[in-house]
Amino acid sequence: MKTVLITGGTRGIGKAVAQEFLQQGYEVILNYFHDEEAALATQSEFNMQGYCPVLMRADVSDEEQVKDMFKEVFRIYGKVDVLVNNAGISKIQVIQDTSVYDWEEVFDVNVKGVFLCSREVAESMIFSGGGCIINVASIWGEVGASCEVAYSASKGAVIAFTKALAKELAPSFVRVNCVSPGVIDTEMNSHLSEVEMEDLINQIPLGRLGTGEDVAKACLFFAENSYVTGEVLSVGGGFSK
């Protein structure tokens, strides 16, 4: 049975990705950090469906915590077949109000976290003859978003990281790809007013918000297709502004 570790896997997009992989018969490890109550509730919800995902608490921006998490995962499962780097944070603010702390906090989770988790899993994947790393970026990393400079820049970095690492690991049959969600109906977009949300929907050719399931199916495609690497798949309903 294949194993997938999903960072930020107990809510939003990560939870939807977990659901998709559980339904496909994967052993699923759900990483979380801040909200243990929500993590346990998600685990319980999956248990009621007959699934048994494992929770792993770790701050993906903390090198030692990431190392400890993967040591425990390797102890239990031996390897990780698929890593989904989904954990991320955003800050809504104009650049004049963005402190160095704000900037570094976003980059620590969104970029450093992807680096640390990918680094820890790479050697195992190489020695086991292959694997798959899927990074969750954002359409804002491709086109930019006003008042989200730090977030947009961090997701642009994730896209560049994906393309570079894909070339580096391809000779070892480790595939690295990126899913780039558009406007998805999750808690991360709850700050948007009804008018702002309507304006965004009007810019989406398919005329609706995306769902976590839409993103999850893209992740599963990358996990299951052995001849795709270095790609960025936009899941945004045609939004490209």
Tell what function each PLM region has.
Residues 10-11:
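Conserved glycine-rich cofactor-binding loop
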Residues 94-95, 102-107, 200:
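Substrate-binding pocket helix/loop in short-chain dehydrogenase/reductase
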Residues 130, 208-235, 240:
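C-terminal substrate-recognition "lid" of short-chain dehydrogenase/reductases
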Residues 138:
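Residue(s) in the substrate-gating loop at a strand-loop-helix junction
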